[in-house]
């Protein structure tokens, strides 16, 4: 996510995902993903039933395993910052050698367009401020190959209690949905080239979604992108639902990457990284 300076950062109905997701008022039902509600319901049940299965390194049926559990084959990033520790992808910064900007571990298996991505993460702040921020880039682009810098859609998460689950566009339009929001992103008719974000519904209260996120422990994240509709889900709870109709900016495809955020010392870990295409 964007450079944040802890601790004073800007602050931004319970949603049972195993039930049918109802279309909020003014939802663009002509979206390529208008049939997603039924799929989300099925996904929620799958997450609840197979949670223990996702702890294994074996990919669920129909998914590709992006991490072999032993080394960073198929990934590229700064080797001083990224390694494999105890079978997990590990990114770590230190107080003695802080990084000056956000950097990323990039999946080299190609680009993704319409997909479901599942991964399990843990983030631990190694500092007095309790600061730690990371995320998963998707449909993104490499902005600086030499420094492993990426821009694009980001499924955000952090060690604090505000940003986990939001949709942020790294090196782009910024926050496209705060946690709990259903948003419609479109051009601002009053300011050509600018972005207008309309909140058209809710998937739940931010604090209730946060209560389902485990502190300094493993959490399951699911990202679904289909057409111009984007969903984030943590531990079976939908956190945002975004339809991006600013087509001059909305990415249809791009790379995947994990973020290591600049700032105080922190450790972020990933495992069980599974991908499947949606058609």
Where are these predicted regions, by residue range?
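Carbohydrate-interacting regions of secretory-pathway proteins
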Residues: 56-279
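Low-complexity, intrinsically disordered or signal/transmembrane-proximal segments
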Residues: 3-5, 26, 34
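Positively charged n-region of N-terminal signal peptides that target proteins for export
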Residues: 32-38
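Short, low-complexity intrinsically disordered segments enriched in A/P/G/S/L with frequent Arg
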Residues: 9-10
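Short, Lys/Arg-enriched N-terminal segments with co-localized hydrophobic residues
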Residues: 13-32
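Bacterial N-terminal signal peptides
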Residues: 41-52
């Amino acid at each position: 996510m964007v450079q944040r300076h802890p601790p004073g950062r800007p602050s931004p109905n319970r949603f049972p995902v195993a039930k049918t997701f109802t279309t909020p008022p003014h939802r663009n039902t002509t979206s390529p993903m208008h049939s997603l509600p039924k799929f989300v319901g099925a996904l929620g049940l799958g997450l609840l039933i197979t949670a223990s299965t996702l702890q294994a390194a074996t990919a669920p049926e129909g998914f590709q395993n992006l991490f072999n559990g032993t080394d960073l084959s198929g990934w590229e990033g700064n080797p001083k910052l990224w390694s494999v520790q105890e079978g997990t992808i590990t990114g770590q910064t230190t107080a003695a050698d802080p990084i000056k900007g956000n950097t990323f571990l990039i999946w080299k298996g190609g680009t993704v367009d319409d997909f479901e991505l599942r991964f399990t993460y843990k983030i631990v702040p190694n500092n007095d401020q309790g600061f730690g921020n990371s995320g998963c880039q998707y449909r993104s682009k490499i902005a600086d190959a030499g420094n492993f810098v990426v821009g694009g859609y980001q499924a955000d998460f952090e060690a604090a209690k505000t940003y986990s689950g939001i949709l942020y566009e790294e090196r782009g339009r910024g926050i496209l949905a705060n946690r709990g929001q259903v948003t419609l992103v479109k051009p601002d008719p009053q300011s050509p080239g600018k972005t207008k974000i309309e909140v058209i519904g809710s998937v739940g209260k931010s604090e209730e979604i946060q209560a389902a996120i485990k502190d300094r422990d493993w959490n399951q994240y699911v990202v679904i992108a289909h057409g111009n509709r984007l969903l984030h889900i943590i531990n079976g709870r939908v956190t945002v639902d975004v339809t991006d109709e600013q087509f001059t900016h909305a990415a249809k495809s791009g790379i995947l990457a994990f973020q290591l955020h600049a700032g105080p010392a922190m450790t972020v870990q990933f495992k069980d990284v599974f991908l499947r295409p949606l058609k």
